[in-house]
């Protein structure tokens, strides 16, 4: 029995999974974790290390479904050919994305019926609470949920290149409401009025014409543009990033923030519960309001070396070592493989070492 991955928005171009958004990145991650896997798509094709198969041709595999709310419907479709469809939910976003009661109930039913793997402890807790509140008690008692922090490819980090003018990053690729882009713009405008900075925002193409993006792009100290062409370029830009200002109200994990921290940027975070899963307790740059955010970001770009020393002290001496111990994607890879083996009896070959593809 093999593995197939389904994400309705995934695009395959020139034999590879295209895009640098979180969904595409995670599909590539799963293909690396399960070599020779399939990707569910509209047209069958052989690609670089994986196959694309239409849903109606999926048979005899564990379907890792990233569109979790659809799993019961997928089960019925697969059941037409397969007497015992095997589906695992992969929740890689915060459950609060579903606000309508019908959507929340559908999510709860899906996670009650099918084993569910989550991208962080916080997400797993929210999933369990949703199932407990929305699903029948006997379904909740039988539900299976596991988690691991997504982590980052530590070997992707590049050597630091400190810029002549400090670079402040908008650490997201969208301008959705929960990211609070207006707060970001308010704070960076204040900081830019006090000291030279270059603010950079790399956004999904559809977001470039949104009002916050247009407003930011009109500032002489700001650059707004599309996502980088490759992961290599992405990490090269992070190596030249001085600081970032996180403003999101809610996150399931915060992969972009972890990557920026691993690259050496000083992160300024809101005082929100999700932040505790990203940085150590006592992290010095957590703000309660816009005034505190301004002061912290100003320090991060004008006294960066001192700020990094504070990060080291908060992490017991070495902030980078703390990050690498807690956000290495090896732990995620091992955990998801273990769950697929335990829940479905799928034999998996051991991963290679640090130089794995």
Residue ranges, per PLM feature:
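Nucleotide-activated donor-binding/catalytic signature segment of Leloir-type glycosyltransferases, i.e.
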Residues: 210-231
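A short, active-site helix/loop in glycosyltransferases that binds the activated sugar's phosphate group
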Residues: 100-143
